[in-house]
């Protein structure tokens, strides 16, 4: 049920060549499974079992980390989601020194094509893999395109029902690039995921030798390798020689709430409205007619919305449709409105518009 409360409270040849360094020990090769190991997971590739190593489920969704281009120097014009999970793992044999690996292909698309159904499926699979009475896995790693990575990572953080570790990882350069960052990112992600020191920290994002909590982490640059950051809160750690080094003991935000989606079959439609000078949001009624169940205002400053837009939003709120006031700046706090006459907007607190959308869908 959507409730009107403050969210502050509710709340590839080149690839193979680049990673073909000799492993530290003899590495078991991937083998194709003829029969799925579990009816809950569509496992298509699995490493041979090594006693004493933890077990990691890699859910691949596509993205730049699985992308390919005709040129090894081209890191902008490429096809995302060209390489499957088996090739990703096989390109980094060092992975099998730190964990036994099962891989499943949830999707193989650019992250702009990730749907609510895919995200809901990943959440349910992660909970099945880690949070049951007899979990099959010790950790989950999700490979993902970077454009919407923070949305999926935050959704998992808000819906994972145990303190096991999920790491979401991507790359800023395709697998075929001469300086592809995917192999090292994947190795660091799996190594971080299976580390006991990672437990109790929520879902983590690992890229570019940095470890970031999903609740705070956001993409800050369209092209640079060091794009995922948490400006206000900072990183929680970074891999040193692939092994995670954390700056602080495990902790969770004081306002964090986890939502159980196990009985949810679909997420409601919530639209994000981008504010600007003289914004009207005239299309909200059409959105409602087409099934929108809520709106996020990506406002100016600390959630500012123009008076013309407020008129349209006041009308949809009068129909019981929730509206969250957030900020397109992506940093800072949108506080609850203390003026009752101003309307009943929900405060996004410190969540940016896309994370506010995911939380509103989960309430």
Regions found by a protein language model. Give the residues of each.
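Fungal secretory targeting signals
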Residues: 1-27
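C-terminal non-catalytic interaction/assembly regions of soluble proteins
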Residues: 21, 44-48, 302-363
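ATP/NTP phosphate-donor binding region
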Residues: 25-129
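Accessory alpha-helical/coil subdomains and C-terminal extensions
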Residues: 53, 59, 67-69, 84-95, ...
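A glycine- and small-aliphatic-rich helix-loop capping segment at beta-alpha/alpha-beta transitions
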Residues: 72-81, 148, 154-167, 182-188, ...
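Short acidic, glycine-rich surface-loop motifs adjacent to enzyme active sites
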Residues: 133-149, 290-302
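Short Gly/Thr/Asp-enriched flexible loops that form oxyanion-binding sites at enzyme active sites
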Residues: 142-164, 305-314
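Internal gly/pro-rich beta-alpha loop/helix module
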Residues: 168-241
């Amino acid at each position: 049920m959507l409730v009107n409360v403050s969210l502050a409270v509710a709340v590839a040849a080149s690839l193979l060549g680049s990673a073909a360094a000799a492993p530290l020990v003899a590495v078991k090769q991937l083998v194709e499974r003829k029969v799925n190991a579990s009816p809950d997971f569509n496992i298509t590739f699995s490493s041979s079992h090594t006693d004493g190593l933890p077990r990691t489920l890699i859910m691949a969704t596509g993205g730049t980390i699985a992308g390919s281009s005709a040129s090894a120097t081209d890191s902008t014009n490429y096809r995302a989601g060209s390489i499957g999970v088996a090739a990703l793992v096989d390109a980094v044999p060092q992975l099998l020194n730190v964990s036994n690996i099962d891989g499943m292909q949830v999707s193989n698309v650019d992250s702009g094509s990730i749907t609510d159904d895919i995200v809901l499926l990943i959440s349910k699979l992660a909970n099945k893999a880690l949070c049951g009475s007899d979990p099959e896995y010790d950790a989950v790693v999700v490979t993902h395109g970077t454009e919407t990575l923070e949305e999926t990572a935050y959704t998992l953080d808000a819906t994972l029902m145990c303190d096991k570790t999920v790491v979401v990882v991507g790359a800023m350069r395709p697998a075929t690039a001469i300086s592809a960052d995917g192999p090292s990112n994947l190795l660091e992600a799996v190594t971080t995921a299976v580390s006991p020191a990672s437990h109790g920290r929520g879902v983590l994002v690992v890229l570019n030798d940095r470890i970031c909590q999903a609740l705070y982490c956001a993409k800050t640059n369209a092209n640079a390798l060091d794009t995922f950051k948490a400006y206000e809160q900072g990183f929680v750690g970074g891999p040193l020689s692939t092994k995670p080094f954390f700056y602080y003991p495990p902790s969770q935000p004081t306002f964090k709430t986890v939502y159980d989606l196990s009985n949810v079959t679909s997420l409601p439609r919530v639209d994000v409205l981008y504010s600007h000078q003289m914004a009207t949001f005239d299309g909200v009624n059409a959105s409602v007619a087409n099934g929108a169940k809520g709106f996020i205002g990506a406002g100016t400053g600390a959630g500012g919305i123009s008076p013309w837009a407020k008129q349209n939003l006041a009308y949809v709120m009068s129909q019981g449709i929730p509206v969250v006031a957030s900020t397109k700046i992506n940093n800072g706090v949108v506080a609850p409105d203390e003026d009752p006459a101003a309307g009943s907007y929900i405060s996004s607190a410190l969540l940016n518009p896309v994370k506010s959308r995911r939380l509103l869908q989960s309430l």
